[in-house]
Amino acid sequence: MSKSTAEIRQAFLDFFHSKGHQVVASSSLVPNNDPTLLFTNAGMNQFKDVFLGLDKRNYSRATTSQRCVRAGGKHNDLENVGYTARHHTFFEMLGNFSFGDYFKHDAIQYAWELLTGENWFNLPKERLWVTVYETDDEAYEIWEKEVGIPRERIIRIGDNKGAPYASDNFWQMGDTGPCGPCTEIFYDHGDHIWGGPPGTAEEDGDRYIEIWNIVFMQFNRQIDGTMEPLPKPSVDTGMGLERIAAVLQHVNSNYDIDLFSTLIKSVAEVTGATDLSNKSLRVIADHIRSCAFLIADGVIPSNENRGYVLRRIIRRAVRHGNMLGAKDTFFYKLVGPLVGVMGDAGEELKRQQSQVEQVLKTEEEQFARTLERGLALLDEELSQLTGDTLDGETAFRLYDTYGFPVDLTADVCRERNIKVDEAGFEAAMEEQRRRARESSGFGADYNAMIRVDSASEFQGYDRLELNAKVTALFVDGKAVDSISAGQDAVVVLDKTPFYAESGGQVGDKGELKGNGFSFAVSDTQKYGQAIGHIGKLASGSLKVGEGVQAEVDEARRERIRLNHSATHLMHAALRDVLGTHVAQKGSLVNDKILRFDFSHFEAMKPSEIRAVEDMVNAQIRRNLPIETNIMDLEAARAKGAMALFGEKYDERVRVLSMGDFSTELCGGTHASRTGDIGLFRILSESGTAAGVRRIEAVTGEGAIASLHAESDQLHDIAQLLKGDSHNLGEKVRSALERSRQLEKELQQLKEQAAVQESANLSSKAVDIKGVKLLVSELAGVEPKMLRTMVDDLKNQLGSTIIVLATAVDGKVSLIAGVSKDVTDRVKAGELIGMVAQQVGGKGGGRPDMAQAGGTDAAALPAALASVESWVSAKL
């Protein structure tokens, strides 16, 4: 009986644990120690700094089963997923690692024992082939003389990629740094499958499959390309769980292993598919794994960075579900089955299951609204295509209008052997960016043209005034030697207490003054390494080289400090209340409010807003110390400091901590203790884009002012309702109930009036060939009452044709009613269409009742006058 995928994973970890390895949990799919990496894509990612000597662990041997995603950037397998036997967006990498401990001998012996040992994987030895780097005689001899593999099954691979050390069997972390030869182990599925051994012309076949790569990090590559031996060589290995499961379960495709077989059946169940060999089932089964685990690790669908990759994968899965005939949202229903097949490796996913399902369902519902229309447009374009390439402009229109990622369009085209002009798509995308840049300008911003060679030293963390020297002056973006009273200018100082706008915090205001002059600073901005004070010279004159006294508006700075510190508390509270997927997407901190944009998939519930507000105020009452430390970027990350993805940081960073509650990288100005904030109140929560929410809040005096404003408003409402704050709710409910009752009575009166009006109108009907025709424009009648009147008139008149109209504020409402015995000759829909066309509108309906609207009230009398002749012709 073959092992299950879960048993194989556990056996691997157990084996290396028995060899003295520390079992280390899988790290997040979102790398926390490498901002250049989109997703964790290898087992060694979490140990990168250990290999580089920047981090130390209390163990020298480790083993993991690491979750990995390859669906963006350099490692992009997306287009092949579902169509080949082994490509996935998500996979698990089994690995064992030595940090300066054992090396080639033990690494090879461990691998052989696990693969062929009777108590472990027990693979037939004659089915295993190995490759080594061409000059790695040591590894070759271990395989041949110690392990006993025949020479014909050991293959040397040289520099087969066109440069020294550029080889399938030489691993490099980058252009410089740790590197070394590797040995790979292949499994021979047998001669009934096409393919040749590695290094031969047929190596891309499916007969010989790489199952394990063992990297020997023994060199440090220098910038000039020379290789220096590492003092402590290390080992990094990787074996795809899905691949070894296919071997041990005696199947040729990863999609036939137990884990995927179960998922594919679940996909068929939720989509209604019956053909289990359909490749769309494989696509969806793969994609639910990457999507669910990415969301569990904090990624939310969006239009940028990791969120956009996730959105692309979700939409590809939804489109394949559509191809299978899925009528309703289905993708989120696969999270439960996924949790079931992942076993112990899915514990974190199980904890977040409901949240992951909600994110997937929301995203699927949003895309479903445009999917059908987008596919129809694409089908139309492809049906008219003369060549074999879809133009980039059309692909861009699908992206821009219907949210189709270009690779989804390429997926559809691929099924019809059509290519997509991706270069043309990129050109159209760049043109849109250019137009956006141009349309965002509201006139010349001369200050944006300022170029300053000098640097300014910011000293405003600890002081709000100091003496400085003017190093540059700019007027309308041009450098000048001096300015005079009344001139707008930018003043650059050698040092300053003024904070320049950065990280969402606005620039300081204040005054620069000196001997006979005063310069009012209205804003402060960065110009490269210089800090510019923007404002107007109120009096006197000022020249380059002159000394000034720089004074920041202290009261304004204090309010900004409180708001900025509250923003950090709120960020931490949001992650606690909503989940760790919450990430900052933008912020504004000024002296009046704080505004914070963050990733979240739905509007916050009132209870969640209250929980965040209460949590922040609880931290304020704790009066936590707010401390800053300058440290290495790596040390800051190790401390758990939150950083923004895509943001570039210096090697030395400023870490802001608020007790044990919040730690972030931040260069802004802050309160001394959380208690200084006083009070925190959320004013609003709203959406700004798909997957992005916005909170606006106030602190301190602003929070108290908002409480007073609400109290005053409640007092005014209470007086209007002749009540007080204690019974206000009861008074409002009573007033609303009374209002509903009065509206009901008013509606009844209107209906009675309509019936009376109908009785008066019936006498105005004329007889045309035995059918009563009534055409009338009614003044002061609500449009919705016309239908009631037509029904009543039809009962009164018998065989009849009725057209009623009313005009309110220039808008025309029309209705036509035809008794059923006349509809074979006159149809209400045709009649109302004829009238509506004359008043600038259109409409339709059933043969016996139809409604329309129009915009040309002046044309209504003539339109109604045309009805009699039109009806006569029909009868």
From Swiss-Prot:
SUPFAM superfamilies: Class II aaRS and biotin synthetases, Putative anticodon-binding domain of alanyl-tRNA synthetase (AlaRS), ThrRS/AlaRS common domain, Translation proteins. It catalyses: tRNA(Ala) + L-alanine + ATP = L-alanyl-tRNA(Ala) + AMP + diphosphate. Its cofactor is Zn(2+). Keywords: Aminoacyl-tRNA synthetase, ATP-binding, Cytoplasm, Ligase, Metal-binding, Nucleotide-binding, Protein biosynthesis, RNA-binding, tRNA-binding, Zinc. One of its GO terms (biological process) is negative regulation of DNA-templated transcription. One of its GO terms (cellular component) is cytosol. Zn(2+) binds at H564, H568, C666, H670. Consists of three domains; the N-terminal catalytic domain, the editing domain and the C-terminal C-Ala domain. The editing domain removes incorrectly charged amino acids, while the C-Ala domain, along with tRNA(Ala), serves as a bridge to cooperatively bring together the editing and aminoacylation centers thus stimulating deacylation of misacylated tRNAs. This is Alanine--tRNA ligase. The lineage of its organism: Bacteria, Pseudomonadati, Pseudomonadota, Gammaproteobacteria, Enterobacterales.
